[in-house]
C-alpha cells in the first residue's frame, strides 16, 4: 500500500470539499482488535506531542510541521484498515473568510485529526485545556498550534479570555475552533452544548460552521484499572470508520439563533449516522 501525503490530502480537500481513503492507501484487511492495535493507533495520535517537544528547542517547529505530525492520525488509521471519510467543505471553500467552527467532541481523535484538515482552508486557532500547553517543552509549541488555553477553574474568566482572544484572532484572519460540549461525550446533548461559540461569532461578526465527527473507533476508557492513567485510550475497534462532516456556512446574526441553527444541523447529521442525541 502507498501512504497518503499531507499535500495530496489537503489538495483533495480544497479541490472537492472532501476526502475518502483511497483503496491503495489502506491496509487490505482491518487489524484485529487488541492491545497491539490500540497501542499502534494511540501512538499515531500522540506522537505529535513528543515530536513537537523535540524540535521546538531547536527553533524548527512550524505550523506546517505541526500539521504533518498531526497527519499521522489519518495515515495511522488507514494502516490499520480503517477508512477516513470527510465531506461537506465546499460551502466553506466558497466563503473563503474566517469562520467559527463548532464541533462535537467524542474522543482524542478529532483533536489531532482536525488540525491538518482545517489548515487546508487557512489558519485557525482553537480552545484547549491549559494543562496541555504547560506540558514539558510544549509551552512554546502551543504558540504554533494557535492554542487558546482555558483553566476550567473559573468559567467567567475562561469566557472572557475566549471572547477577547477569539475576537482578536478572527479579526486577524484566523478561523476559530470550539468544542461546545467542553469535554468528551458519546451523547450529543443540548444540556452539555455551550453557547460560547455562538457568542464569540456574534461579537467577532463572523459566520458559524458546524462540524460533526464520528470517532467511536477509540472511545474513552470508562472501566478497569487503567481508566485513570489511560482514560483517553480505550480499546480500538477497527470495524468503525472515522467520519467528519462539515455543515453550511451560517451567516452571522444573534447568538441565540446561531446557537440553535448549529445545534439543529449537528443533531440531525449525527442522528443520520445512528449516533445518540438528546434534544
Model-derived regions: residue spans:
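Catalytic core of membrane glycerolipid acyltransferases/transacylases, capturing the structured
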Residues: 38, 43, 48-57, 61, ...
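Membrane-anchoring hydrophobic helices of lipid-metabolizing enzymes
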Residues: 1-99, 112-113
